[in-house]
């Protein structure tokens, strides 16, 4: 057991004590932070590692290391992440129920690790539970383990404070007065992407910031709003292809691999043959006859295990390999963005999409999403869209529900997994959720999409809405009750940094254009959204010179595992 101001490192031996079967085991490392001015849980997961397949009698040494700073808690009064003074007990086991104390880390002074600002003020402050006056959990022998634990002093002054610099409203890009710029000009270094964007009209940028569909009609139910790949969820625009060489990209849903229509028919002109009812087509493709001169196509994709099952493996190498499988098929079907992984917290077992999400633990969720993303983004020009950002923890009234969450709970539970995924994998995109948090639609939340994701975590890709977020869907989903909250708006999506609105509709474009005209939407903000979308598009597999998206970033590690 070792620890300093930078890392906590645990080395454990795993042995198969059976005499018949080979097997694997997981080593889990927890920490118990001291109660100072902030109450703490009994223990929190700090790191984990999975052994190789061990034969009877075989053993393996596993070393697990995680940043000391990751044990910090969020202090709402200080608007900062803090390591409070006291003793941090490190516990090791193969589950949260079997941990034993391995060491005691002593921090003499409270340290602010990150100084930021509160972003999620409560609109209806919940009554928080307290453990004051409650006998703390313990087990036989715990006191003796603490007394005998290895004592390690951590240097308080060696831990430096990071101060977040928050961005301001972007200024309009300086106008490029030269000839009309193209993607080739940007790629060759003749001009910058900002130069190109400065030449775009408001109408062009409003189109760039929307998908190519005309609203969320029946086809939206089956995620089939793409004009390019049957069954794919949607496309970015090709309006800039003819004169600027900027291709469109295709987005396909998940979660168990690529969700495409496995069987479809086109006529002699290359148009899909349809019964006229998209829902009927989705379930009765085999009944559609092939017309004279037509062609029958098959595009079957591999079904990988769903997220909840993958997380139960505790095997990040396995999850990365599953991402690699999806990445190879994205290349085959020319899909640029996989609308997965979903990584919301398992808050309630009644959530209808829990199978799509990894865990109730934010570290597990974040590491799984990062492993999946790294597997996919090891392929050139493709990426993931981690979702649903954030606090999408129920399906009932998911479009209009308002989640009341404290600042600390938001950061330590509901955002922590997304933060880990961004810092350790840099997903190409993030998908915002339908719901509100503390009275603000997540799709319209500048504090969530820009201040947290970009300013605090360094997210570099673009943010998209979930399908139909900025449309009025109360009639489409036949809600029978009065809605307290309306839907998010296109103008506020752009203001928040929600760059791409999907699946796109004319009303979204018109609202953006009108808002720039009346001065309620700064031109620089629209240009910035268009820039972020095109920056990703120009790195997509639509171009022969594309590279693995993640290669350009200096990625962190939430947990480092080595085996011997």
Listing of model-derived features with the role each one plays in the protein:
Residues 1-73, 82-96, 116, 120-564:
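Glycoside hydrolase catalytic-domain context in secreted enzymes
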